[in-house]
């Protein structure tokens, strides 16, 4: 690795522009961010979004593709930056293990990034729990806000998968232990503060967004905000450094901004807007990713992030894999990787319905689509070629085999050339979002459910319709909607593979993320606090007497 100050100097960042965390990691200071935003006006600002088909639980290589494509664009003579989310400890120790790409397309220093990195997640956890503590102090010590303890919407947060904390009771310590009430924990990445951080333009905007977060409702049903409990200043203070984007490097020496990490199944699922705007001032291409399949991350990127950040994508890379196609073709739930390994090209072809639905969905936004077939070691030439032929001949979209995991930029030239062609042919006037701001909340939900997920209709259960009425009363009806849905299926039933038909999307709750500026519509299968599997990835991790880590990725 190259010292970070030397690596980024040709990209417009000097020694005084960085706040250092060792030799290979830094944050970009505010004055440099502002300068780069101005410089972006003289750059091409080609925005390339990487998304994917509905993945297996192990993932199909979106981050590998994002990193590999960024490296390859530089390899073929372009100037490209990379922006990705930073990992959460929960998934790192849970199912997926370490996350920052892999093989010859990874971001370094991998161990630091996956563990504590620059402390952004810790800062968010502290700020979130400070708000929770100040809220409970207000409730138990002279509540002049008349807070309804049965209508507190702000939980606690922890950056660890722990199902035992999904439902808790607090205040059981007697007279000095606070007011007893039901409570819960969420993963830090699921906190509204994470979404706020990633949508804020600067520290001033961050503070304003934090102030309007709704933490509870009073006995009259009116919202109680962070500002009402006087937590705006101290909470934002804890995030003073967290809003600065982190800059590191890929294994081939391309600068990468790794910042923020909201989940795409319960939030908007992309890295921070600050990172994106900074990257636009450093290169002519920005390659970024959206979480999970395109039904979740990409839809939210188009309808929420581009709306909030005034951005227009020039190309979308849809990551597919032989493994994921077999997963759908064999109609598996739960996944059986041994059966996938034994299946042949017939299973691949049987899974095309899922890939096709994702490709058609993306075309609705008016952005050129390039399918990237991320090749795994066990894939046969026949299987990969079947996917490429189907994309080119049946779907009529660009497609390329990607070997960036094994070969780095040498394995991504065909993909990069297709992406360059797509961006050159793109017309920003063709870009369109699925719905307008002034569409009703139910219209927005119905549009996403039918156009993207393939549902026939939407069914509202529990108090969801009352929630929508309340959102209208609070003048939140012009907010975009973030659909909180399982990532295991295009539908709201994780067991349904391919492109399910003849079903209704069930919405159980709608609530505001007033600081982030969107509404969240919950389906029946969405968890804000995941649990560890019977044998988590953590069980295979270790550290020796010299401090060398093994099993992290």
From Swiss-Prot:
- May I ask which residue range the UniProt record assigns to the signal sequence? none
Q: Which domain of life is it from?
A: Archaea
List, in alphabetical order, the GO biological process terms annotated in this UniProt record.
tetrahydrofolate interconversion
InterPro entries linked: Formate_THF_ligase, Formate_THF_ligase_CS, P-loop_NTPase
The residues listed in the UniProt record as binding ATP, with positions renumbered to this chain, are: 56-63
Q: Which GO MF terms are attached to this record?
A: ATP binding; formate-tetrahydrofolate ligase activity
Which reactions does this protein catalyse?
(6S)-5,6,7,8-tetrahydrofolate + formate + ATP = (6R)-10-formyltetrahydrofolate + ADP + phosphate
Which pathway does the protein contribute to?
One-carbon metabolism; tetrahydrofolate interconversion
Q: What EC numbers are recorded for this enzyme?
A: 6.3.4.3
Q: Report the enzyme's class at the first EC level.
A: ligase
Determine if Lipid biosynthesis is one of this entry's keywords: no
Q: Which UniProt keywords apply?
A: ATP-binding, Ligase, Nucleotide-binding, One-carbon metabolism, Plasmid
Sequence similarity:
Belongs to the formate--tetrahydrofolate ligase family.
Q: What is this protein called?
A: Formate--tetrahydrofolate ligase
User: Which organism is the protein's source?
Assistant: Haloarcula marismortui (strain ATCC 43049 / DSM 3752 / JCM 8966 / VKM B-1809) (Halobacterium marismortui)
Q: What gene is behind this protein?
A: fhs
């Amino acid at each position: 690795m190259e010292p970070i100050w030397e690596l980024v100097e040709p990209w417009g960042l000097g020694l005084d522009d960085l706040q250092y965390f060792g030799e290979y990691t830094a944050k970009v200071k505010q004055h440099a961010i502002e300068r780069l935003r101005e410089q972006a006006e003289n750059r091409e600002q080609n925005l390339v979004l990487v998304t994917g088909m509905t993945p297996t639980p192990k993932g199909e290589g979106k981050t590998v593709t994002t990193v590999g494509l960024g490296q390859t664009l530089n390899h073929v003579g372009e100037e490209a930056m990379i922006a990705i989310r930073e990992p959460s400890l929960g998934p790192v120790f849970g199912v997926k293990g370490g996350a920052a790409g892999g093989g010859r397309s990874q971001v370094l220093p991998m161990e630091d990034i996956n563990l504590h990195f620059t402390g952004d997640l810790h800062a968010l956890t502290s700020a979130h729990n400070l708000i929770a503590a100040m809220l409970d102090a207000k409730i138990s010590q002279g509540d002049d806000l008349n807070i309804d303890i049965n209508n507190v919407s702000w939980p606690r947060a922890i950056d660890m998968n722990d199902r035992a904390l999904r439902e808790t009771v607090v205040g059981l310590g007697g007279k000095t232990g606070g007011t007893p009430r039901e409570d819960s924990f969420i993963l830090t990445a699921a906190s509204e503060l994470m979404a706020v951080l990633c949508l804020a333009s600067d520290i001033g905007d961050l503070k304003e967004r934090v102030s309007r977060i709704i933490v509870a409702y009073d006995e009259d049903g009116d919202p109680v905000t962070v500002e009402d409990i006087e937590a705006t200043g101290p909470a934002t203070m804890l995030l003073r450094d967290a809003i600065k984007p982190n800059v590191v490097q890929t294994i081939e020496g391309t600068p990468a901004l790794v910042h923020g990490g909201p989940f795409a199944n319960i939030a908007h699922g992309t890295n921070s807007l600050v990172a994106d705007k900074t990257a636009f001032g450093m290169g002519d291409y920005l390659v970024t990713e959206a979480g999970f399949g395109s039904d979740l991350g990409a839809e939210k990127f188009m309808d929420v992030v581009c709306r909030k950040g005034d951005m227009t994508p020039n190309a979308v890379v849809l990551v597919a894999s032989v493994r994921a196609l077999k997963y759908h073709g064999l109609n598996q739930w739960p996944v059986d990787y041994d059966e996938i390994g034994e299946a042949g090209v017939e299973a691949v072809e049987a899974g095309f319905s899922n890939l096709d639905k994702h490709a058609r969905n993306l075309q609705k936004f008016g952005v050129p689509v390039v399918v990237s077939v991320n090749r795994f070691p066990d894939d046969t030439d026949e299987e990969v070629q079947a996917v490429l032929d189907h994309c080119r001949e049946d779907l009529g979209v660009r497609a390329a085999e990607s070997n960036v995991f094994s070969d780095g930029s040498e394995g991504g030239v065909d993909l990069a050339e297709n992406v360059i062609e797509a961006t050159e042919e793109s017309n920003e006037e063709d870009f369109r979002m699925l719905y307008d701001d002034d569409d009703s909340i139910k219209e927005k939900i119905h549009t996403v459910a039918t156009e993207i997920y393939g549902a026939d209709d939407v069914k509202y259960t529990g108090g969801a319709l009352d929630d929508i009425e309340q959102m209208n009363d609070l003048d939140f009806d012009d907010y975009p909607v973030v659909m909180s849905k399982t990532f295991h299926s295009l539908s709201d039933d994780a067991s349904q593979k391919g492109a399910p038909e003849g079903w209704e999307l069930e919405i159980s709750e709608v609530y505001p993320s007033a600081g982030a500026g969107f509404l969240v519509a919950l389906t029946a299968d969405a968890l804000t606090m995941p649990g560890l599997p019977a044998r988590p990835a953590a069980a295979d991790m270790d550290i020796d007497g010299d401090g060398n880590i093994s099993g992290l990725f």
